[in-house]
From Swiss-Prot:
Coiled coil: none annotated. It is found in: Cytoplasm. GO terms for cellular component: cytoplasm. This is Elongation factor Ts. The gene is tsf. PROSITE patterns: EF_TS_1, EF_TS_2. Belongs to the EF-Ts family. It comes from Dictyoglomus turgidum (strain DSM 6724 / Z-1310). Keywords: Cytoplasm, Elongation factor, Protein biosynthesis. The keyword Cytoplasm applies. Its main location: cytoplasm. GO terms for molecular function: translation elongation factor activity. Pfam families: EF_TS.
Amino acid sequence: MEITIEMIKELRERTGAGVMEAKKALEEANGDMEKAVTILREKGVIKAAKKAGRVAKEGIIEAYIHTGDKLGVLVEINCETDFVARTDEFRKLAKDIALQIAGMNPQYVSKEDVPPEVIEKEKEIYRTQLRNEGKPEHVIEKIIEGKLEKFYEEVCLLEQPFVRNPEIKVKDLITEAISKLGENIVVRRFARFVVGEE
């Protein structure tokens, strides 16, 4: 199938890819637009993985105050250069993440931030529940792993389904931004405040 300029333009608008990347993806997908998007996303993940090791020491602190002034969020998001930190794309990402924190109330940034004693406590609760349900011992550990993944989705910001598009997780949203902006991006820390809460 012949790849037209219009097809390349459409794919670039949808993905933010360069001209040659878009053309190669369309050729690889035999002109199938959805398949080409998938190919570019996969390549974007590879690019993002390469950038993950780079130091991100620039960035911004985004503040969000919910209507009624009863709930507020501060989040620090870092990138590699102040140029990227000033872009609309980066600021939109920071705002989306602040809204995510306000709405979903995560406790930690990532799985690695969850203290081992919290994980052990959760495992023990699940183990007791499963034994009380009469589950065989040989399947309990497998079930616990599945339950832990659900637990991470509730308490870890990066593992949560993104509120504006639950098809993807917050970490996927950041990976897409890394791919588009060409720099490593890290959610460093956040604080969520609710009036009257300790």
